């Protein structure tokens, strides 16, 4: 499992120009079963995406198709982790 941390590198009004395209990118990856949860940081300096995929390299290829990355309004950092413990109803996400 992975945490994708997006950090805006341009002002919010510039980021906003690509928000609809970014949302479409997110929706496509939710439909593929890759993204599990996402949302903006507070304060709004970027966003977080939790993803489930077999390899970091595959995920990097996907993230590099994000309109925020293509248009250079955001940078990203990917952190891999094992979801060893989950809340009720999320047992299917557990990894060992």
Question: What do the PLM-derived regions correspond to, one by one?
Answer:
Residues 1-96:
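Conserved, structured core segments of small domains
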């Amino acid at each position: 499992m992975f945490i994708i941390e997006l950090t805006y590198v341009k002002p919010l009004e510039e980021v906003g120009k690509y928000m609809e395209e970014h949302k479409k990118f997110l929706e496509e990856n939710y439909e593929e079963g890759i993204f599990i949860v996402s949302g903006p940081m507070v304060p709004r300096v970027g966003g977080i995406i939790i993803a489930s995929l077999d390899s970091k390299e595959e995920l990097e290829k996907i993230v590099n198709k994000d309109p925020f990355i293509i248009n250079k309004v955001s940078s990203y950092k990917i952190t891999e982790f094992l979801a060893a413990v989950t809340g009720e109803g999320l047992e299917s996400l557990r990894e060992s």
